[in-house]
């Protein structure tokens, strides 16, 4: 039996969707092929890599990719992680389940270096908890 496809989308495929892909591969890889992409490709944010390393998940080999229409149309589940992606994401066929799980953009955090870093950690933990919940309950 082939695995289902889950596709995490955000604006730049730099932070949130990259962390979601990492957590998805960690929690969901037995049943799901996990991908991420963005409306634009801003490159992998080094703080996203650092934040994920703190929880033992290496995303340093992931790439920042634009949405691939064929993958979008063949996915079983598409998850938008920011309002911009939810608004601008191309239409998906009726058979593709689509949900919005909104998270703050850690790359836009303000304050001291430590305060900005705490936002990366918080968003990472929120994304991880949401994907773990999905892995455990299917919701």
UniProtKB/Swiss-Prot annotation:
Active site per UniProt: 10, 82, 89
Membrane-spanning intervals of the chain: none
Entry superkingdom: Bacteria
Enzyme class: oxidoreductase
Gene Ontology CC, one term: cytoplasm
SUPFAM superfamilies to which the protein is assigned, alphabetical: Phosphotyrosine protein phosphatases I (SSF52788)
Catalysis performed (reactions): arsenate + [thioredoxin]-dithiol + H(+) = arsenite + [thioredoxin]-disulfide + H2O
GO biological process, one term: response to arsenic-containing substance
Signal peptide range in chain numbering: none
Sorted UniProt keywords: Arsenical resistance, Cytoplasm, Disulfide bond, Oxidoreductase, Redox-active center
Disulfide bonds: 10-82, 82-89
Family: Belongs to the low molecular weight phosphotyrosine protein phosphatase family. Thioredoxin-coupled ArsC subfamily.
Purpose: Catalyzes the reduction of arsenate [As(V)] to arsenite [As(III)].
Entry-linked HAMAP family: Arsenate_reduct (MF_01624)
Record's protein name: Arsenate reductase
Organism: Shouchella clausii (strain KSM-K16) (Alkalihalobacillus clausii)
């Amino acid at each position: 039996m082939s695995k289902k496809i889950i596709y995490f989308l955000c604006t730049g495929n730099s932070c949130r969707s990259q962390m979601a892909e990492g957590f998805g591969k960690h929690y969901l890889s037995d049943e799901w092929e996990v991908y991420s992409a963005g409306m634009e490709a801003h490159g992998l944010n080094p703080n996203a890599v650092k934040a994920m390393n703190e929880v033992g998940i290496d995303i340093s080999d992931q790439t920042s990719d634009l949405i691939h229409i064929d993958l979008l149309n063949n996915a079983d589940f598409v998850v938008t992680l920011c309002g911009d992606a939810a608004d601008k994401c191309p239409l998906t066929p009726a058979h593709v389940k689509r949900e919005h799980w909104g998270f703050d953009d850690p790359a836009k955090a303000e304050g001291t270096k430590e305060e900005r870093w705490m936002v990366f950690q918080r968003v990472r933990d929120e994304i991880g908890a949401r994907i773990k919940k999905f892995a455990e309950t299917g919701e």
